[in-house]
Amino acid sequence: MSAFNEERVLGVHHWTDRLFSFTTTRDAALRFSNGHFTMIGLRVDGKPLLRAYSIASANYEDHLEFLSIKVDDGPLTSRLQHIRAGDTIIVGRKPTGTLVVDYLLPGRRLYLLATGTGLAPFMSIVRDPETYEKFEHIVLVHGVRKVDELAYHDLLVEHLPSHEFLGDIVSSQMHYYPTVTREEYRNMGRITHLVESGRLCADLGMPALDPAHDRVMICGSPAMLRDLEHMLEQRGFAEGNTSIPG
């Protein structure tokens, strides 16, 4: 059996000239946990050209969704950015990853801290009803350079809170905090500074980050991951994995 499925592109949305998302069909046998990533790509000269992409859609949806940057000289993204509805892409059969709520210890508040396309796995997690059963508050922070890079802003602000099944719990438990670094906006600053200064929690009316009650997931640039990991470790947070919850 092949390690990949061929899926048909259903739609493509170009957020900016550097950012796009797309949906595809989903093989009925594909199973994944919200927060997982999988290998996706295109066939080039008869061979698969693949990269790891987080799945932005929830695991109960009948389609798959992915969020991607555009890199003109990127081996895959230089081609992927030109896909259209009806095109075929390759999707791995074995999604995996550690950004899964089940790998966290119980807590009161879940912080999801993302920069850029690091938002993708958290879009899956905030659409999962079980997330709201495990935590009283879910704080989704998305840091970008410019306002138009706030992908899924309207979905998070308007559509999810009015969702037929998720609307009530999203409205009462999810706190969306978009922040911008290079343009004027209601929230400004890098996530690392917002966390370190205490401004993030203050703006949200939340207590200071506390490993006794708070759980944190981070996804984004290597520099952001490194800085936040160090910052959180200094505050007493312990990194979890598939065998030891954190």
Where are these regions (language model features)?
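Conserved beta-strand elements of the Class I
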Residues: L110-L113, M217
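Generic structural signal for buried aliphatic residues
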Residues: T38, I89-G92
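Ferredoxin-reductase
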Residues: S2-A85
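Reductase modules of NAD(P)H-dependent flavoproteins
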Residues: S2-A3, V141, D148-G246
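A short, basic/flexible loop-to-alpha-helix module at the beginning of a structural domain
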Residues: P95-L105
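Ser/Thr-glycine-rich phosphate-binding loops at phosphate-binding pockets of nucleotides
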Residues: T115-P121
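Cofactor-binding loop segments of dinucleotide-utilizing enzymes, especially the Rossmann-like FAD-
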Residues: I69-V71, T115, G143-R145, T181
